[in-house]
Amino acid sequence: MLMPKRTKWRKQQKGRNRGKSFRGNKIEFGDIAIKAVEAGRIDSRQIEAARITMTRKINRTGKTWIRVFPDKPLTAKPLETRMGKGKGAVDRWVMNIKPGRIIFEMAGVEEELARAALTLAIHKMPFKCKIITAKDSHELY
């Protein structure tokens, strides 16, 4: 599971996820990638599930890059607990995703197989995504 080794503060405020992604919106390493079409939050477990499905589909050939890292703690109070008595404990780690953000990249795999693997990974995402290639990378959204 992806999570920071240490953070300055244990808990964060929720914040807002607005606007479009101006960082991490172009293919940097691979030939084909998954790009977010709408805003959402991705969990470390969802990233890991997508990574496992992709690597199994491509039979561990080629190279895959994970371009997102969950660095925001999400807290939750235990079930059947009354309100009050402080903020809950850290439940999981997430990252806010804005439209246009590249999530995974892949190289060294033939395009048909890469598309099949990335399609399986898209089904694990909690928001709409699309597959783009390096020549489409200049399109922002």
Curated annotation (Swiss-Prot):
Cross-referenced CDD domains: Ribosomal_L16_L10e (cd01433)
Region spans: Disordered: 1-23
Kinase in keyword set: no
Alphabetical GO biological process terms: translation
Record keywords: Ribonucleoprotein, Ribosomal protein, RNA-binding, rRNA-binding, tRNA-binding
Domain of life: Bacteria
GO MF term set: rRNA binding; structural constituent of ribosome; tRNA binding
InterPro entries, per database record: Ribosomal_uL16, Ribosomal_uL16_bact-type, Ribosomal_uL16_CS, Ribosomal_uL16_dom, Ribosomal_uL16_sf
PROSITE patterns, A to Z: RIBOSOMAL_L16_2
HAMAP family: Ribosomal_uL16 (MF_01342)
Function: Binds 23S rRNA and is also seen to make contacts with the A and possibly P site tRNAs.
Similarity comment text for this entry: Belongs to the universal ribosomal protein uL16 family.
Subunit structure: Part of the 50S ribosomal subunit.
Name the record gives this protein: Large ribosomal subunit protein uL16
Source organism: Sulfurovum sp. (strain NBC37-1)
Gene this chain is encoded by: rplP
